Amino acid sequence: TSTDAKQFMVYFDGQEKDRFETFFGALNLTYTPNKTSSYALLASGYLTNELVAYDISGEYWLDQAGTSGGGDGGSVIGGELGVGRYHEHARNRLKASVFSLGLRGANGISNHNINYGIQYNREKIHERSREWELHDSAGYSLPVDPTDLKVIYNQYSNHDISTNRLSAYVQDTYRISSSIGYFNINGGIRFSYWDFNKEFLVSPRFNIGFIPERDPRWAVRFATGLYYQSPFFKEYRMPVYDADGNITIELNNKIKSQRSYQFIAGTDFTFRAFNRPFKISAEAYYKILGNLIPYEVDNLKVVYTGINSSKGYATGLDLKLFGQFVPGSDSWLTFSLMKTQEDLNGVKVPRPTDRRYSIALYFTDYFPKFPKLKFSLRGIFSDGLPTTAPRSTRDKGYFRTPAYKRLDIGFSYALLPERAEGQPKRSGFFGHFKSIWLGLDVFNLLDISNVSSYYWVTDVNNIQYAVPNYLTRRQINVRLSIDF
């Protein structure tokens, strides 16, 4: 703050080498014996190979900064708070493959449309992970121990695991027209089993939509259901501490799927203005959350506790206005309010995704009298997210990052406009192209420094200070878009 200013200087050394390889493949076979029935056989595969390797060191100075007290507004150094060095090391390897085989069917019977399916998943995961972090202050490794050399953080993980999942579902969509309007009713149930934790789940859900006969511009809807999110590998990695504070990762086979009871109500209203179509959409929701797996965001890494130790809720309101000024491209304005909270170790704290408000705008239109020139404007203003110190939790203390603010503008010029309906086809070289656009974009027009994460520094009194890392500021981008 202006009354408690700090001066921070750091020199970095080292490097990081990461590799992320992802492969997808899918095969779908569909059989349609008649207009009301269809069947599909689906097979897919997913493979990821990840390597995160770094050795990064830094030497830092943290000083108390003051003001000179005069009218010159100069600054002076008010005392040394910390001098030290740190070293972060990681060799993390993860290989994962997921194979899926499923059968789906759909049958139409009168006003009913029945969908059903069954799917089998086979998951194989290979992980080797070693991380440690060394802090050195005035030649002493922290924490100081007269008998042993210790580091401030050390983690080891070595796992090979194969699991199987089986799921099935059935749902019925019923459509009916009456004297008061049109109804669309959908109800279904999903079953799932996972052999890793021997968990069998039943998930019912229901939704209804209504369009009144008297004014079909309106549409209202309501949905409710019990939903489960089955954990994947990183969510059931559970840290276990020994007497010296070293961490070994174990896989928690007692983990349960996170649960959510959801209630959602919404409405849409379509109308025309300025000789263009518009739609207003409003939606309110409330979700009761249980069996939550708490997590924290450390820089750009998500760290899970690996246990179901929390419960909470999420509620909010979304308002959206859509308009089409350019054919085939929607402009929109959104306003959202949200509150999500959980009970963490007996303390009520906001969840890491608790963004309490957000306003976003996207507008695109042609310039008057210049149909080849198109303008776009995109802006966002949203609340900051809760954050805390590394290897800490929000129940021990947290703060919010500053609000996110950004404005982008763009200009596009049609070097080759799209052919209008009724116009003859182009000949020659340009006959192979549908349209060609040359664009100029200015990202972060106002050159705002938005915080992405924090670098944490510890002083001689073991007090931690958050030094912000900023996202990219203003950028200019030139693009060429060709449609065939």
Model-based region annotation:
Residues 372, 380-390, 413-484:
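C-terminal beta-signal and adjacent terminal beta-strands/loops
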Residues 18-197, 281-284, 332:
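Face-selective signature of the C-terminal outer-membrane beta-barrel domain
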Residues 32-38, 108-113, 176-183, 213-218, ...:
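Short loop/turn motifs that connect adjacent beta-strands in outer-membrane beta-barrel proteins
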Residues 19-23, 95-99, 162-166, 200-202, ...:
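Residues that define the transmembrane beta-barrel architecture of outer-membrane proteins
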Residues 38-44, 50-52, 56, 254-308, ...:
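Membrane-embedded beta-barrel scaffold of Gram-negative outer-membrane proteins
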Residues 41-47, 116-122, 187-191, 208, ...:
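Transmembrane beta-barrel strands of outer-membrane/channel proteins
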Residues 175-181, 285-288, 305-389:
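Gram-negative outer-membrane beta-barrel transporters
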Residues 2-4, 213-263, 277, 284-305, ...:
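Surface-exposed extracellular loop regions of Gram-negative outer-membrane beta-barrel proteins
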